[in-house]
């Protein structure tokens, strides 16, 4: 799943996604279920390097947040199927307010792809039972980690120090 997901996303597409993340005033990240865990993990990483990112899994709060977004903001929607009604409602509202949408979704054509400014694709060989979404979630996590590493590499002056400082603050809690 991970090799296939890397193969289907060109370096150019990945760098365009990095630019969307880096240039956004605010990044709202959402996903449902296992995709929501990937969203939360990625938002924490982005915050560590100074990117204003929020993960929102509560769909009522998500819709309230999205309607107040602007063209300077980015909605990152993570959904393997790309067909979750809640995620597509948020994407539709983001479009209405002029917000850009980055989707991390499956390669099979879906509703989320049609609304997104840009897509990164995950390839997963899920069984009918979706094997607890292990394959798709692993591919999503790999892509978000790749985006994070690229963002760090593009900001070597500040990002590593911010990560170290964040870790030092957390260590003070224990």
Positions of predicted regions on the chain:
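Helix-enriched interaction subdomains in cytosolic or periplasmic regions
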Residues: 1-3
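A short, well-structured juxtamembrane/interface segment
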Residues: 6-23
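Glycine-rich phosphate-binding loops that contact phosphosugars or nucleotide phosphates
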Residues: 23-142, 146-155
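A short, charged, Gly/Pro-tolerant segment at domain boundaries
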Residues: 157-174
């Amino acid at each position: 799943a991970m090799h296939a997901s890397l193969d289907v996303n060109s370096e150019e597409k990945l760098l365009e996604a990095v630019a969307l993340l880096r240039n956004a005033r605010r990044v709202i990240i959402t996903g449902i279920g296992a995709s929501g865990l990937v969203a939360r993990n990625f938002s924490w990483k982005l915050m560590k390097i100074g990117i204003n990112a929020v993960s929102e899994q509560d769909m009522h709060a998500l819709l309230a947040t999205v309607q107040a977004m602007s063209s300077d903001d980015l909605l990152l929607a993570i959904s393997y199927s790309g067909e979750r009604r809640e995620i597509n409602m948020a994407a539709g509202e983001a479009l209405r307010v002029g917000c850009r949408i980055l989707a991390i979704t499956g390669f099979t054509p879906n509703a989320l792809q049609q609304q997104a400014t840009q897509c990164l694709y995950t390839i997963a060989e899920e069984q009918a039972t979706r094997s607890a979404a292990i394959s798709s979630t692993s591919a999503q996590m790999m892509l978000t980690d790749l985006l994070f590493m690229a963002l760090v590499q593009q900001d070597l002056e500040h990002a590593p120090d911010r990560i170290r400082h964040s870790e030092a603050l957390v260590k003070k809690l224990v």
